[in-house]
Design a protein with these regions (language model features):
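C-terminal scaffold of the Radical SAM
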Residues: 1-166
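A short, conserved structural fragment
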Residues: 75, 180-185
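Short amphipathic alpha-helical interaction segments
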Residues: 165-180
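Short secondary-structure junctions
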Residues: 69-70, 178-182
Length: 185
């Protein structure tokens, strides 16, 4: 959901509408910033995105409001009531297999990624025709890192080392040294 797409409303609309969503007692919410593309209906009608400061302020407002209402902020964009984590999303954030159904969907079975066509016409004519992605072990390992760092759970380095046949601390020593003050080991 997005409450602060327009530069002109200065976040007022979001702060007015958001409490109404809380009254619905929805068990899981994902909050994303709407990207306004030039050729979209929004772009063509002159809707301007808000600036990054307002976007950050609104995200902070939403985060604090949801946490005060008992939601768990477990991934960059995801919040849930206790016991209502998204099982599908957790699968890819925790480096597990997952299924993707429909036009443009991606999935991973037995460690092999696939993408369905993004062409609705092709998908409707031919059904799912997954294109399998040939990833190296190093590419899969990097993807696992990036996904894990999106969550409050982080990355289990021992498990990563075993699965990707590498030494995380050795492989990323320069990066870790550069940002050591921000990491918890």
């Amino acid at each position: 959901m997005n409450f602060w797409t327009s530069k002109s409303n200065n976040g007022r609309c979001g702060k007015k509408i958001f409490p109404q969503f809380l009254s619905l007692d929805i068990p899981h919410l994902s909050i994303y910033s709407l990207q306004i593309e030039e050729n979209s209906i929004f772009g063509k009608t002159g809707v301007k995105p808000c600036d990054s400061d307002l976007e950050a302020d609104m995200f902070e407002y939403i985060t604090k409001t949801l946490e005060a209402a008992g939601y768990i902020h477990y991934e960059i964009s995801s919040f849930c009531k206790p016991g209502h984590y998204s099982k599908h999303n957790l699968a890819y954030w925790q480096d597990k297999d997952f299924y993707g159904f429909g036009c443009g969907a991606s999935g991973r079975i037995n460690g092999i990624r696939y993408d369905n066509t993004t062409s609705l016409k092709e998908y409707c004519s031919n059904g799912p025709c997954p294109v399998y992605i040939d990833e190296t072990l190093a590419e899969r390992g990097m993807d696992a890192i990036m996904m894990a760092l999106r969550t409050k759970f982080g990355l289990n380095i021992r498990e990563w080392n075993l699965k990707y046949q590498s030494d995380f601390k050795e492989q990323y020593a320069q990066v870790l040294d550069k940002y050591r003050e921000y990491f918890l080991f």
